[in-house]
């Protein structure tokens, strides 16, 4: 068919109780979530957590031995495949799904809020 895909992009932010700001960007294709990008400012640092990479030094403290950007990469791919609403959260704002916690054990409630908001804002 020669119909052009309907591509929409949206962006949103969420600020947590530590004052760290999450930015979520999404790309929708024909109404379906195709791309998700999540990043967050790091307290007292002039680079984002993604930009800090291994220098953010979460790996040592991580139950699954993964740095922040690695856990977020996993989460982004999961959301692209299964959507935000497929993720169940516990009271701490962390995922309960085993197929999420295998790659992402950090608190993600704010990230999910930002992604949902970005989807709403997609134009």
Which residues fall in each region the model found?
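Sec-dependent signal peptide cleavage junction
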Residues: 1-3
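Active-site- and interface-proximal helix/loop "cap" or "latch" segments in soluble metabolic
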Residues: 7-9, 14-123
């Amino acid at each position: 068919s020669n119909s052009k895909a309907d591509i929409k992009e949206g962006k949103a932010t969420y600020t947590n109780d530590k004052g760290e700001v999450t930015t979520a960007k999404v790309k929708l294709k024909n109404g379906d979530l195709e791309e998700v990008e999540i990043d967050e400012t790091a307290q007292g640092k002039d680079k984002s957590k993604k930009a800090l990479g291994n220098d953010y030094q979460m790996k040592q403290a991580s139950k699954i031995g993964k740095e922040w950007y690695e856990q977020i990469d996993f989460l982004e791919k999961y959301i692209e495949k299964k959507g935000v609403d497929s993720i169940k959260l516990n009271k701490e704002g962390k995922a309960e799904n085993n197929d999420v916690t295998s790659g992402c054990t950090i608190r993600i409630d704010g990230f999910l809020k930002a992604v949902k908001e970005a989807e709403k804002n997609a134009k």
